[in-house]
Amino acid sequence: MAAKVVLDFEKPLYELEEKLSEMRVYLKSGEFDARTESREGLRGEIEALEAKVESLRKTIYKNLTRWQKVQLARHPERPYTLDYIYMMTKDFVELSGDRQFGDDKAIIGGLARLEDKDSGFSQSVMVIGHQKGRDTKSNLYRNFGMAQPEGYRKALRLMKMAEKFGKPVITLIDTPGAFPGIEAEERGQAEAIARNLYEMAGLKVPVICVIIGEGASGGAIGIGVGDRILMAENSWYSVISPESCSSILWRSWNYKEQAAEALKLTADDLLAQGIIDRIVPEPLGGAHQKPEVMASTLKSMLIEELQGLLSKDASTLVDERIAKFSSMGVWNEAEA
């Protein structure tokens, strides 16, 4: 069994949980000395420690710094695109290749059905997203979620297919950035991303983009132009990672915490700036604590957004999408 991943700020909580677990085992074992200890007394100690654990858990996760949210977004147990696809949809059929160079495993996509029995909603959708690996072998296979030009061209091919057949597009963003290797540059990495921005702005079907983990720079926005932008509570979205920003400004990664604060890259920050539309709440402690709950929450929000978008005609969707992205940012004009 793989060792439990504990982030640095989680260590005090982990230590208390370990102590609590030991006390529960001790109580069940019956090995305590009945002459000096009572079962009721031990139960009282356990209940007190349980309350302390819950209090500390809330204190930690309700007061996360921006850098701590970056750490949670990168948690290796966090659900990835395929996890969400299998938890939220049915009848997923993966589609491969860009029909020009090859099939990039860092981006996956295909047709699936999103439905809710309670409301009667049922809609075939095109789901596209970055996919990371869980271990060294799978990370090499997935290129650590860093897409090549053929990955973005595959994504665009699937989007245009969805447009042709009138299917909404859902993208799940989770990448440390587009692959920066020279071979990717030679095959037109910048052009592939730029082409996606241009084409996604004009897609005549609803497009919903969700940042589920890391949203780094062009690698993220390459599948990130949509009618609605949703963002998981403990994800991040920025033009640059905190480490890279730190290395540029301070010539060292040691200032990554300060960089994260300056970048304002959390869901709360971006909602306040009007970059995203909604925050997807996560279970206390992160999406990896209760993946099924997280997937259910996201699914409900996707269905809610789709119901509104499907009522709009193609021209309205395109006009509103372009206006949405055109209004982002601040223009400063130099005096003549």
UniProtKB/Swiss-Prot annotation:
Record field: catalytic activity: N(6)-carboxybiotinyl-L-lysyl-[protein] + acetyl-CoA = N(6)-biotinyl-L-lysyl-[protein] + malonyl-CoA
GO cellular component: acetyl-CoA carboxylase complex
Cysteines joined through disulfide linkages: none
GO process annotations (BP): fatty acid biosynthetic process; malonyl-CoA biosynthetic process
Pathway: Lipid metabolism; malonyl-CoA biosynthesis; malonyl-CoA from acetyl-CoA: step 1/1
One example GO MF annotation: acetyl-CoA carboxylase activity
UniProt domain CoA carboxyltransferase C-terminal: residue ranges: 48-308
Function: Component of the acetyl coenzyme A carboxylase (ACC) complex. First, biotin carboxylase catalyzes the carboxylation of biotin on its carrier protein (BCCP) and then the CO(2) group is transferred by the carboxyltransferase to acetyl-CoA to form malonyl-CoA.
Name of the protein in question: Acetyl-coenzyme A carboxylase carboxyl transferase subunit alpha
Organism of provenance: Chlorobaculum parvum (strain DSM 263 / NCIMB 8327)
